[in-house]
C-alpha cells in the first residue's frame, strides 16, 4: 500500500499503481467527471498514469492552470491529428500548450496552410474529438523511437529524439496519431467540445534563424461552446485595449525600422508618464531605505564570465564591442546584478551594515529574435526597476515582507486590485542541481511561505520551479478584463555572492557570505507600461496621466483666454494643453477623449468674461461651470487624495 497525502493534510492508503482517476472516483463520481489531470509530488501526471510511491497529491480541474495545460496540450495533438489527415506527408515539429491555448509547428511540404484553411481544420478536429479516442501513454526505447519516427520520415522528431537520454522517452497516441511527448494529457479527446484556430504564422525550427521556417498554427479550445463565445468577446475587447494601438493614439512611444527592431523610443508624453512612474517608485524606495546608483551601459566580458551570465546567456547577447587598443571585449549590459555585486565589494562590509539595498533604473539589452518581438512587452532594450538587497540569512524574511509592501503599494496605486503569487521552491527529490546549503535553502523557503501567510497573500507553491541559485516569489496581476500578467519578482540568490566572493564580517569576527535578493516591482518600465495601458485602456490614474487637462476654446478669438487658463494651471503643477485647432467644438471633444485626457475645459465668451471654465470629465460628461482657480483646487485635491493612499 502507498500513502496519498491530500492538500488539506488528510492521508489515505491505496494499492501501489493506483492512478489519479481512481483516486478521484474514490472521493466522488462527480469529481471524477470534472478532473483533467493530477499533481504527484509537484509533477503533473495524466489521470491514467500509475502512482507507485507515497505522494503529495492534488487533483486539477478546468479552473486550475495545470488542468488547462493538459487540456490544451491534448488539443495541440488533436490539431496535429487533423493536419495528418488533411495534409498527407506533413511533418511535425513541436506542439506545446501555452498561456492561452496551444500551437503546433509543422512543415507542410509543398502545401501552403493559410488562415482561410483554418475553418476546415477546426471541423476536422471536432470530427475527431467526437470519436472520444483514448489518449495512451507509452514508454519507448530510443532505438525504437528513432525507427518509428524515421520510418514515417519525421526528421524533426528524429532530431529531438537523438538528443534525449534512453529510458526517458515517451509517446502519446490517440486514434491514428502518435507523437513524441512528455505529457501530461487528458485521458480522451472527448472533453474538447469548442475549437478556435486563431492565427497562422511563421516560426524558425527551434527558434534559430538559420533553420527552416515552419508554419505555426495557434489555437484555443474549451469544454463548452459558451466558454469559447465568452473568450471571443474577450478577444475583441483585448484588441481595443492593445497597447500598441493606444500608445500610437496617445503619442506615448514609437518604433523605427531605421533605428532598429525592438528598440522603443519614448515620445514626450510617454517620457513624462515613465518619469512619473520612476519618481513614484523612488519616493517609496527612499521611505524603505534604498540607495540609488547608476552603472555603465556596457561591461567587460570578464564581468559576465565571473557572474556566469556569459556561459548561460551569451547567445542572447549582442555581438561584443572590441576596444582598439587593449583588444578587450565589452558587451551591452544584459542585466544589472553583476555591476551591483562590484559596488558591494567596493567597501569592507560588517554584519551591522546589512541589509544593504541598492536600486537602479538600469537599461539593459538582450537580443530577441524578430518573430518574438511584440510592442513594449518583448523588446531588445528595456529599463528594469532593479534593486539588489544584500543581507544576512536571518534577515531574508523581513526583507521579503518589506519588498512585498512595496509591490502591494505599486499594484494598488495602479488599480490592480486582484493579484496573487507563485512560490517557486526546490524539487522535493532531486536537489543536487541547487547551489547553497540545505540549511540556507530551508530557511529561505520557509521565510517566503511565512511572509506570504503574514501578508494574507494568496500564493501557490510550485516545487521544482526554483532557479538553481535560490527560491523566488512571482506576482501575477489580473487586469480589467480578467487576463493574468506576471509583474514583479523577488528572487533569492546564493550563486552570485559565491561567484563574486562577497563577504561581510560577522558578529563572531568571521567572514560570511551574504544572501542576495533581486527584486523588481515593475519588472521593466516597458512591460509595465504596456500592461498598464491594456488594464486601463489608456485611462491612467489622474496623477500619472501625461496630460491632465485639455482646454478647448470654441473659436480662435478665445485662444488668448485659453492660454491664460493654461498658464495658471501649470503654475499650480497641473499638466494642461490648449487645443487651438480651427475645428468645431464637438470634434475637439471627441479627439481629446480619444487621447484619454481626463478633464476638458471648454471656454467661450461667457467663460472669458467671468473668469470661468465649463468642465467635462472623461466618461462622465458635463460637470458644470466654475472659476478656473476653483477647478485647479479641486483637481489638486483629487490628485493629493490619490497620493496620500501611498
Curated annotation (Swiss-Prot):
It is found in: Cytoplasm. Residues 1-61 form the TGS domain. The gene is thrS. It comes from the Bacteria. Signal peptide: none annotated. Binds 1 zinc ion per subunit. Catalyzes the attachment of threonine to tRNA(Thr) in a two-step reaction: L-threonine is first activated by ATP to form Thr-AMP and then transferred to the acceptor end of tRNA(Thr). Also edits incorrectly charged L-seryl-tRNA(Thr). One of its GO terms (cellular component) is cytoplasm. GO terms for biological process: threonyl-tRNA aminoacylation. Pfam families: HGTP_anticodon (PF03129), TGS (PF02824), tRNA-synt_2b (PF00587), tRNA_SAD (PF07973). The lineage of its organism: Bacteria, Pseudomonadati, Bacteroidota, Bacteroidia, Bacteroidales. Zn(2+) binds at residues 337, 388, 518. This is Threonine--tRNA ligase. One of its GO terms (molecular function) is tRNA binding. Homodimer. The keyword Ligase applies. It comes from Bacteroides thetaiotaomicron (strain ATCC 29148 / DSM 2079 / JCM 5827 / CCUG 10774 / NCTC 10582 / VPI-5482 / E50). Keywords: Aminoacyl-tRNA synthetase, ATP-binding, Cytoplasm, Ligase, Metal-binding, Nucleotide-binding, Protein biosynthesis, RNA-binding, tRNA-binding, Zinc. It catalyses: tRNA(Thr) + L-threonine + ATP = L-threonyl-tRNA(Thr) + AMP + diphosphate + H(+). Its EC number is 6.1.1.3. Its cofactor is Zn(2+). Residues 242-541 are annotated as: Catalytic. Belongs to the class-II aminoacyl-tRNA synthetase family.
Amino acid at each position: 500500500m502507498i500513502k496519498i497525502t491530500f492538500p488539506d493534510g488528510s492521508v489515505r492508503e491505496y494499492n501501489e499503481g493506483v492512478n489519479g482517476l481512481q483516486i478521484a472516483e474514490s472521493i466522488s463520481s462527480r469529481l471524477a467527471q470534472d478532473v483533467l489531470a493530477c499533481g504527484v509530488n509537484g509533477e503533473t501526471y495524466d489521470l491514467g498514469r500509475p502512482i507507485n510511491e507515497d505522494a503529495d497529491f492534488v487533483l486539477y480541474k478546468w479552473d486550475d492552470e495545470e488542468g488547462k495545460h493538459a487540456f490544451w496540450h491534448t488539443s495541440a495533438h488533436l490539431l496535429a491529428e487533423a493536419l495528418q489527415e488533411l495534409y498527407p506527408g506533413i511533418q511535425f515539429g513541436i506542439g506545446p500548450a501555452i498561456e492561452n491555448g496551444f500551437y503546433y509547428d509543422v512543415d507542410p511540404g509543398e502545401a501552403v496552410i493559410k488562415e482561410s484553411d483554418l475553418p476546415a481544420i477546426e471541423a476536422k478536429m471536432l470530427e475527431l474529438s467526437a470519436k472520444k479516442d483514448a489518449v495512451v501513454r507509452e514508454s519507448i526505447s530510443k532505438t525504437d523511437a528513432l525507427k518509428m519516427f524515421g520510418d514515417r520520415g519525421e526528421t524533426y522528431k528524429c532530431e529531438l529524439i537523438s538528443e534525449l537520454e534512453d529510458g526517458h522517452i515517451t509517446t502519446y497516441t490517440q486514434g491514428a496519431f502518435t507523437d513524441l511527448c512528455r505529457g501530461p494529457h487528458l485521458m480522451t479527446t472527448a472533453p474538447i467540445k469548442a475549437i478556435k484556430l486563431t492565427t497562422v504564422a511563421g516560426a524558425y525550427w527551434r527558434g534559430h534563424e538559420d533553420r527552416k521556417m515552419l508554419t505555426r498554427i495557434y489555437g484555443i479550445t474549451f469544454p463548452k461552446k459558451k466558454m469559447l463565445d465568452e473568450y471571443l468577446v474577450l478577444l475583441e475587447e483585448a484588441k481595443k485595449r492593445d497597447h500598441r494601438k493606444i500608445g500610437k493614439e496617445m503619442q506615448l512611444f514609437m518604433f523605427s525600422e531605421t533605428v532598429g527592431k525592438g528598440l522603443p523610443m519614448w515620445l514626450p508624453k510617454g517620457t513624462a508618464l515613465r518619469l512619473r512612474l520612476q519618481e513614484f517608485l523612488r519616493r517609496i524606495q527612499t521611505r524603505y531605505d534604498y540607495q540609488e546608483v547608476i552603472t555603465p551601459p556596457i561591461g567587460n566580458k570578464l564581468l559576465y564570465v565571473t557572474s556566469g551570465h556569459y556561459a548561460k546567456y551569451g547567445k542572447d547577447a549582442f555581438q561584443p564591442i572590441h576596444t582598439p587598443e587593449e583588444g578587450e571585449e565589452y558587451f551591452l549590459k544584459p542585466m544589472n546584478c553583476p555591476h551591483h555585486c562590484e559596488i558591494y565589494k567596493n567597501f569592507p562590509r560588517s554584519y551591522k551594515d546589512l541589509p544593504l539595498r541598492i536600486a537602479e533604473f538600469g537599461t539593459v539589452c538582450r537580443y530577441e529574435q524578430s518573430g518574438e518581438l511584440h510592442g513594449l512587452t518583448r523588446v531588445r532594450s528595456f529599463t528594469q526597476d532593479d534593486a539588489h538587497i544584500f543581507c544576512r540569512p536571518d534577515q531574508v524574511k523581513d526583507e521579503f515582507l518589506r519588498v512585498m509592501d512595496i509591490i502591494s503599494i505599486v499594484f494598488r496605486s495602479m488599480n490592480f486590485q486582484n493579484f496573487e503569487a507563485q512560490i517557486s521552491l526546490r524539487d522535493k527529490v532531486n536537489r543536487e542541481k541547487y547551489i547553497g546549503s540545505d540549511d540556507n535553502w530551508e530557511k529561505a523557503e520557509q521565510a517566503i511561505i511565512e511572509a506570504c501567510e503574514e501578508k494574507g497573500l494568496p500564493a501557490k507553491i510550485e516545487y521544482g520551479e526554483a532557479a538553481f541559485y535560490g527560491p523566488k516569489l512571482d506576482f501575477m496581476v489580473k487586469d480589467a478584463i480578467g487576463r493574468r500578467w506576471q509583474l514583479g519578482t523577488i528572487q533569492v540568490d546564493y550563486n552570485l555572492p559565491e561567484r563574486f566572493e562577497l563577504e561581510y564580517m560577522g558578529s563572531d569576527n568571521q567572514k560570511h557570505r551574504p544572501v542576495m535578493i533581486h527584486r523588481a516591482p515593475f519588472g521593466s518600465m516597458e512591460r509595465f507600461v504596456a500592461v498598464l495601458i491594456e488594464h486601463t485602456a489608456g485611462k491612467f490614474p489622474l496623477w500619472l496621466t501625461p496630460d491632465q487637462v485639455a482646454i478647448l476654446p470654441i473659436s480662435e478669438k478665445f485662444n488668448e483666454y485659453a492660454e491664460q487658463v493654461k498658464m495658471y494651471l501649470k503654475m499650480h503643477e497641473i499638466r494642461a494643453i490648449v487645443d487651438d485647432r480651427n475645428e468645431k467644438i464637438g470634434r475637439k471633444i471627441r479627439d481629446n477623449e480619444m487621447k484619454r485626457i481626463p478633464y476638458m475645459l471648454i471656454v467661450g465668451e461667457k467663460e472669458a468674461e467671468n473668469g470661468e471654465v465649463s468642465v467635462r470629465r472623461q466618461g462622465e460628461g458635463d460637470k458644470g461651470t466654475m472659476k478656473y482657480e476653483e477647478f485647479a483646487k479641486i483637481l489638486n485635491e483629487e490628485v493629493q487624495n490619490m497620493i496620500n493612499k501611498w
